[in-house]
Amino acid sequence: MSKIVGSDRVKRGMAEMQKGGVIMDVVNAEQAKIAEEAGAVAVMALERVPSDIRAAGGVARMANPKIVEEVMNAVSIPVMAKARIGHITEARVLESMGVDYIDESEVLTPADEEYHLRKDQFTVPFVCGCRNLGEAARRIGEGAAMLRTKGEPGTGNIVEAVRHMRRVNSEVSRLTVMNDDEIMTFAKDLGAPYEVLKQIKDNGRLPVVNFAAGGVATPQDAALMMELGADGVFVGSGIFKSEDPEKFAKAIVQATTHYQDYELIGKLASELGTAMKGLDINQISLEERMQERGW
């Protein structure tokens, strides 16, 4: 008997429900509860936040299932978990545990340098990172129900997330004025499925939500990404590496919701302690940049 998989419509609909919200990285039940109380729409369960993964080096793998279960039992909001790029078994284990989403994530060490997961063969919806329309279309073609910018995780530096969001949006704008022949050439140049690009052209936007991720450290960062067209925000190290995680979590949720209320954002920022220490992207070699993982 063949395995039943979720339809694109159902998976994308589930992701749409998170639109306008904040998804926070957590490493235990206590942090998950802080995130839920602050108004997060979902949490990402993992063993270490990206800044700690970066500092530790070595091979970063899927979180211990005990951590994921602990988080799932602690909150009522959706729980996501990360699997390595191309690691079929990690993803199947997470699916069997009943997580709400799987992030095929470049934050972890890739298991396969040639192939991403065939996400359309799973029941659980997937979120994936992208830096440009080519990566976005390839992941959608594989069955991703949700996208996010890659940014540069664990840096507290928003510059790469801004670059990736602007690039995807500008390439979508270019695509919308192309005829079918031009789309065919564009698909070849990008190495992306023609059918996905045609759908984007016809709708004038991506068929899935695209969140901001990678470097969000302050309420202002979150609001900026919403201003640039993000459908929501992932916050990794920015909250629990800050001086006051509870205040930062609440402030980032508020700033994401009211991203054009600059007086409120200023007030929120003035009441916070010190944000996480940021890293200059230029001090990170290409080989060490997580955003370079995947294709």
From Swiss-Prot:
Keywords: Lyase, Pyridoxal phosphate, Schiff base
Pathway assigned in UniProt: Cofactor biosynthesis; pyridoxal 5'-phosphate biosynthesis
SUPFAM superfamilies in the cross-refs: Ribulose-phoshate binding barrel
InterPro entries from the UniProt entry: Aldolase_TIM, PdxS/SNZ, PdxS/SNZ_N, RibuloseP-bd_barrel
Residues bound to D-ribose 5-phosphate: 25, 154, 215, 236-237
MF-aspect GO terms: pyridoxal 5'-phosphate synthase (glutamine hydrolysing) activity
Binding-site residues, D-glyceraldehyde 3-phosphate: 166
Catalytic activity: aldehydo-D-ribose 5-phosphate + D-glyceraldehyde 3-phosphate + L-glutamine = pyridoxal 5'-phosphate + L-glutamate + phosphate + 3 H2O + H(+)
Lineage: superkingdom: Bacteria
Entry EC number(s): 4.3.3.6
Keyword Iron in annotation: no
Gene Ontology process terms (BP): amino acid metabolic process; pyridoxal phosphate biosynthetic process; pyridoxine biosynthetic process
Record flagged with keyword Lyase: yes
Active site: 82 (schiff-base intermediate with d-ribose 5-phosphate)
Residues forming coiled coils: none
Similarity comment: family membership: Belongs to the PdxS/SNZ family.
HAMAP family assigned to the protein according to its UniProt record, in alphabetical order: PdxS
The protein's role, per its UniProt record: Catalyzes the formation of pyridoxal 5'-phosphate from ribose 5-phosphate (RBP), glyceraldehyde 3-phosphate (G3P) and ammonia. The ammonia is provided by the PdxT subunit. Can also use ribulose 5-phosphate and dihydroxyacetone phosphate as substrates, resulting from enzyme-catalyzed isomerization of RBP and G3P, respectively.
Subunit record text: In the presence of PdxT, forms a dodecamer of heterodimers.
UniProt-recorded name of the protein: Pyridoxal 5'-phosphate synthase subunit PdxS
